[in-house]
């Protein structure tokens, strides 16, 4: 955003990026009086911490979900309720992980780190070590949901982290993908609308 000039009025960052935009000064506070629908959001999303600074709201969430742990139930029998699945030797070469920061957070949870969004240098080093340990097991780091769907359809992978769409598409096509609910917990995400600095004066922004 810093180097792109004033070519847009709004930007939609995920929750782990939104505060960086606020701190960088490239977005401005949102006038919630001009967004009446914001008051009808679930309470947890009306003034979330990652969009709050100096008593002001800096964005409005519009979607949310979880990063799922998914396995092909026809090929993975009795999977553990754990994030350990992608690190299991039993699935060497049959694992796919998202090429995204969320995989770093997932790995940190698996490593037992309490606050995966604010790691110390030592915790980050531990997470890196665990990630590298699992790298030889990974068939491919997926980038898009369509890419991951293809990997499952072709039988190239049997376990991954995934978006909700991967499960939905699999069920629609009759494939037996199931979600694991890990004891270590899962990652959640939100996308929000923020207002580029100076764009609030444009009535079309709201």
State each model region's role:
Residues 196-206:
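Extended ligand-binding regions for polar small-molecule ligands
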Residues 1-9:
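Periplasmic binding protein-like
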Residues 1, 18, 148-151, 167, ...:
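Short, hydrophobic alpha-helical packing/hinge segments within bilobed ligand-binding/sensory domains
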Residues 17-22, 153, 159-176:
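A ligand-binding cleft/hinge motif common to bilobed small-molecule-binding domains
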Residues 8, 12-153:
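Extracytoplasmic ligand-binding site segments that recognize negatively charged/polar headgroups
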Residues 125-134, 173-197:
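Periplasmic-binding protein-like
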Residues 1, 38-46, 188-193:
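Short, charged, surface-exposed secondary-structure boundary motifs
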Residues 8-12, 141, 158-163, 179:
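Paired acidic/hydrophobic, glycine-rich loop segments that form the ligand-binding mouth/hinge
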